[in-house]
UniProtKB/Swiss-Prot annotation:
Domain UmuC: 6-187
UniProt gene name: dinB
Lineage of source species: Bacteria, Pseudomonadati, Pseudomonadota, Gammaproteobacteria, Pseudomonadales
Primary localisation category: cytoplasm
Protein name (record): DNA polymerase IV
Known EC number: 2.7.7.7
Family that this chain belongs to: Belongs to the DNA polymerase type-Y family.
Cofactor(s) needed for function: Mg(2+)
Annotated GO MF terms: damaged DNA binding; DNA-directed DNA polymerase activity; magnesium ion binding
CDD domains, sorted: PolY_Pol_IV_kappa
Active site (catalytic residues): E106
């Protein structure tokens, strides 16, 4: 089997970068893109000057201004971001047809069969970065590796404006030093559970056989076993289409009642809005839904056609879903089904209520 060559390209603070490009007076100052604080807006992204103050994506604009009083917050211009994204994807298509967009600002490319630069994935990534910089006047970071899991980690390794390469013969050593929190699909709760088992990095994870991991983590144990060895067989799908977009949170301490669940909704919905703003224009938001997993691992999902995507609608759905079990809750999720427009264009105003 031919060794795969995967590139993960991730634009550096994409929305903010476009704003600074189009208005140079914003460069070098703390900048965020998002909704206004007086309308309970949320930060979609921010530049590195703002991040130095602790400002982060999905944070409320009000809290961001408390951390950084000099922060400039501009409204999202989705048309401009989508146009820039199209230009970047046009560049990608010069090297391969196997492109899997993850959002407006990141994508996987499979260049295993590309003849450009003698088939060198590293040189292709270098050229993509050069062309994006020259044509769009923004920077992107890229990771090159034998699979998607490692390519995504690599693209983050030297951010911003960096390139990191993991060759096949470097995989075993590179992965052995990774903290388990870096593994695809490992969130805080799973990382904490691994830590309690004495597993903090992939070298320690490799000491566990597959069956033992399955006993502890169910089917995800098999995935952990593979990732600890740098194995990821997922293909780059250029025709993959999202069915939904959602946000879930597993709580360290079970939520004891409906009131405590409802209190968690606003934060989940703010994060959902941020994620929805990153999907491309070929989707239209459809039915909202909620997911509840109870302390005994039973779960229920409720979606409602015709319901709004406002806080009140989600509160009503969550109440109905909770009442199906009426038990302490370990996981809450909120989401939206997506309608595939296949290239349709619709402006989504997701940051202002």
């Amino acid at each position: 089997m031919t060794q795969r060559k995967i590139i993960h390209v991730d634009c550096d603070c994409f929305y903010a970068a476009i704003e600074m490009r189009d208005d140079p007076s914003l460069a070098g100052k703390p900048l965020a893109v998002g909704g206004s604080a007086d309308r309970r807006g949320v930060i979609a992204t921010c530049n590195y000057e703002a991040r130095a103050y602790g400002v982060r994506s999905a944070m409320s604009s009000g809290h961001a201004l408390k951390l950084c009083p000099d922060l400039t917050i501009v409204k999202p211009r989705m048309d401009a971001y989508r146009e820039a994204s199209k230009e970047i994807h046009t560049i990608f298509s010069d090297y391969t047809d196997l492109i899997e967009p993850l959002s407006l600002d990141e994508a996987y490319l499979d260049v295993s069969d590309s003849a450009h630069f003698g088939g060198s994935a590293t040189r292709i990534a270098q050229d993509i970065r050069r062309r994006v910089s020259n044509q769009l006047h923004i920077t992107v970071s890229a990771g090159v590796a034998p699979n998607k899991f490692l390519a995504k980690i690599a693209s983050d390794w030297r951010k911003p404006n960096g390139l990191f390469v993991i060759t096949p013969d470097q995989v075993e050593e590179f992965v052995s030093g990774l903290p388990v929190s870096k593994l695809h699909g490992v969130g805080k709760v799973t990382a904490d559970k691994l830590g309690k088992l004495g597993i903090n990095d992939c070298l320690q994870l490799r000491e566990w056989d597959k069956l033992a991991l399955v006993r502890e983590f169910g089917s995800f144990g098999e995935r952990l076993w593979s990732l600890a060895r740098g194995i990821d067989e997922r293909l780059v799908h250029n025709d993959s289409r999202r069915q939904s977009i959602s946000v879930e949170n597993t709580y360290d301490v079970d939520l004891p009642d409906l009131r405590s669940c409802l209190d968690k909704l606003p934060e989940l919905l703010e994060t959902l809005k941020t994620r929805m703003a990153r999907i491309d224009s070929s989707y239209r938001p459809g039915k909202p839904f909620v997911k509840v997993k109870f302390h005994d691992f039973t779960q229920t999902t409720l979606e409602q056609a015709g319901a709004g995507r406002d806080l009140g609608s989600y509160q009503l759905m969550l109440t109905q879903a909770f009442n199906r079990g009426g038990k302490p809750v370990r996981l809450l999720g909120v989401g939206v089904r997506l309608e595939d427009l296949r290239g349709g264009f619709e402006q989504m105003e997701l940051f202002e209520r």
